[in-house]
Amino acid sequence: MIRYTVAGHSRRCVVGASKRVGAIKCITVAATKRFISNKPNEVFTKLTNDNDPKRDAFFKYTWGSWLKNDKQEKEKRFTKFSIEGLNRILNDIYIQSNEMAKAPDGKILPPVFNKNLTVSLVNNVVPKNIGKINPNEKVQVTTLSSIHEGKHHRIYKVDTNLNKAFILRIPYPLENENTLSYRIRSEVATMDFADLKLGIKVPKIFCYGVNSLNPVRQPFVLQEFIEGELLMKDWDPLIEDGSSNQKKYDNVIKQVSDFQSKLVSLKLNAFGSIYFNNDLKDGNEKEFVKEDIYDGETNPDLQNRWKIGPSVERCLWRHKSHLDFHKQMKPFLGPWPKKSPMDIIKNTGLLEAENAKTRIAMKEAGSSAELMYPRTLKEQITTYENLAKIAPDLFNVKTKAIPNMQELLSPRLFHPDLDPMNIIVNKEAQEAYLLDFEGACTKPFILQNSPQFIAYDGPKIYDLKEDITDFDKLSEAEKVQYQFMYKRTRNQHQWEKKLNDNNPKLITAVAPPVKLLRSPYIAAVERKTEEEYLLIDESLLQLKEVWDIFAQNELVNQKKFPLNYSKEDIERHVEDLQKLHEKLISTPFAATQGWIPQDMFDQLLNSGSIVKQENGDYTVKQPEATK
């Protein structure tokens, strides 16, 4: 049974090489329960025939369906690649491994840019990581297994005739190659930094390509396969206090918090994202901060290995492929000097405003087919320009009212998906490995949002009996609601308690006033839909109500709230926000933008709960009103 997997999948595909030379066995597995699969069906295809249509099913997206534009969304996630090209790359890294065996022990070499437009991390391509190959022997892919279809990547397990497995990550082509190039280059360098400098256990990366011109014919990352279980298996956010699984609950909090502690342990010298220094040879030197990424490095192999360059935080790149990269995006991506932490917020606002303006211009010119109301885009412009305007005043960076303010403002590494779903515990040593550094960046801890698995913005309940009057007299339905609030509060409190244990100088970042001050920026970072600009407005209006108090305590720079809202502005906002909440409540699967896990989708379709329309979209059949 494959262990490097994610709960909730509905299908798994396998391609295997048969004993017949040059043949590939395609295996498609339909799963009806999590982690449980039926006996697979087998289809054979020639190894060298990259254009065999029998393979297409292996590359198609199968883990979910969309109510709207299902065909188009799945086509965007089609990840066809060259198996023969992958085979060549595997043979190349084993040749490099033999060469690395001659290097002095402990020597850390820089990445090697190969002639086939891939990059090898030769310090990882060593026999202890990938095994040895006999002279004149060739590496052969024996089995390919599709083990995860995530939000951003397709994950394949690659087995070889050397009894050595690898992981191949193929990003979905949801954005242009320039975006994917920056993202992959930074993620690989960041994982290298986390491994070699911070001592964080991550899968070793062996080779990667940033575009489709390499032998794989797709951007890719080839990395170590870790056999084990996801830490999420032990996470139950609604566990009862004193449960028999309490130790598992506590261990999850500890493991994730320990990773965070290592991520933020080193103060860096700029804000942005991490890249390899030798990316400079083909790039623009102005993209990178000239000084060292951090101070005090004594290992000559690590000196000048990494640089800080443009931020690859997802919010800065999402849905911006239509912008002119050099003129409209690059000026807002950093890197930013450590003396200007609030420029991150300012540039986030300016970039999103520029994006909305461009989309309006494209619609007016008739060059955009997107279905978006101009009023929504105009409101976004106002919202993001307000965010940019208030950015310099959100925090008084010289305040004494917030303890250890300079520690909170220092550049530190931020992992946007710090979550039990991204931590795998290996089978043999029971050691935790942190996965998926996509979108990682360096920014002040005071601007880093809490991990999503413990984040909670609702009413806080710390003790059901003390905080809720006559709790025992409530109905069972009311008790369940309050118990849910209590458990979410408890989870967040346990996380913050662990933060205080590990990093006491950073604990004031979770103080309620600090959370409120950064809330407009966090709402911008976490925005998922067009209408959620309203959540940024809501945070700004909440700040308006308490600004005078914050100013009196020297938490902010200006005595007067920097933004102007008329009575009509506020009334319109309240009305629009109410409509958004009603839409989220009344629209099925609104929280997932209409995406439904495939096993659930099939059940709903077969039962008649969802109905296919003539245009290919699906509607959810509303239950008939009871008489």
From Swiss-Prot:
Q: Which UniProt keywords apply?
A: Mitochondrion, Transit peptide
**InterPro entries from the UniProt entry:** Kinase-like_dom_sf (IPR011009), Mito_inheritance_9 (IPR051035)
Write down what this protein is called.
Altered inheritance of mitochondria protein 9, mitochondrial
Q: Which pairs of Cys residues are joined through disulfide bonds in the record?
A: none
Q: What is the lineage of its organism?
A: Eukaryota, Fungi, Dikarya, Ascomycota, Saccharomycotina
Compartmental location: Mitochondrion
Gene Ontology cellular component list = mitochondrion
Into which family does the record put it? Belongs to the AIM9 family.
Q: Does the keyword Ribosomal protein apply?
A: no
PANTHER family for this protein: ALTERED INHERITANCE OF MITOCHONDRIA PROTEIN 9, MITOCHONDRIAL (PTHR36091:SF1)
Q: What else is known?
A: Present with 8200 molecules/cell in log phase SD medium.
Q: Which organism is it from?
A: Saccharomyces cerevisiae (strain ATCC 204508 / S288c)
Q: Which gene encodes it?
A: AIM9
Asked whether the keyword Transit peptide is assigned, the reply is yes
Gene disruption phenotype: Increases frequency of mitochondrial genome loss.
Q: Where is the transit peptide?
A: 1-43
List the signal peptide residues: none
